Regions:
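Conserved SAM-binding loop
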Residues: 3-86, 179
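S-adenosyl-L-methionine-dependent methyltransferase catalytic module, highlighting the catalytic core
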Residues: 60-67, 73, 77-181
């Protein structure tokens, strides 16, 4: 395992060029590890990139974010996708413990306005590189293409969407965030 990219909680989404970690010994999984058991089985600053797709909503995510921060190299990036709080998927899966706003992970970014109580955690990412709200793209819901484009025009548009009736009228699918160590 010499890859410098980690696919955390990969499930069946095994990615070439990544260390693929999951709690189940599925085909292609390189490391079997329960993400509820920390620390992660890697040295400090082992990875330049971490993919964390559809994982955090199943766990007590703050300690795992701390571990992701530990195994990332300085300047390394973590890409996170989790269900948006307006998504019905939040409620369909009994293993989901939490849902996310586009701003939830800003709590862990040094100097961010949302990080006013960041003293509860011993780690902080240096910056938020990107944050998007995604929507289901089905032929039966063609308006979602336009809604997604409008909602993601700016952080103010995202806040307006989440804080008004629009979030209930046009439920989102996921939040996608990239944090930099």
């Amino acid at each position: 395992m010499t890859a410098d990219r980690l696919n955390l909680g990969c499930g069946t989404d095994v990615r070439p060029g990544f260390v693929n970690l999951d709690s189940a010994a599925l085909p292609g999984v390189d490391v079997v590890h329960d993400l509820n058991v920390l620390p992660l089985p890697f040295e400090d600053e082992s990875f330049a990139e971490v993919v964390c797709q559809d994982v955090l909503e199943h766990l007590d995510y703050a300690p795992l974010l701390g571990e992701i921060h530990r195994v990332l190299r300085p300047g390394g990036r973590v890409w996170i996708r989790s269900p948006h709080f307006t998504s019905r998927a939040v409620y369909l899966d009994p293993t989901h413990r939490t849902a996310f706003s586009v701003d939830t992970l800003r709590f862990f970014v040094r100097g961010d306005a949302f990080a006013e109580r960041s003293y509860y955690f011993p780690f902080h990412f240096s910056r938020l590189e990107s944050a998007r709200i995604t929507f289901h793209r089905y032929r039966a819901m063609p308006w979602n293409y336009a809604v997604e484009a409008l909602v993601n025009r700016s952080p103010a548009a995202q806040a307006y969407y989440e804080g008004t009736f629009l979030g209930r009228l046009f439920p989102a699918s996921n939040v996608e965030v990239t944090l930099v160590k």
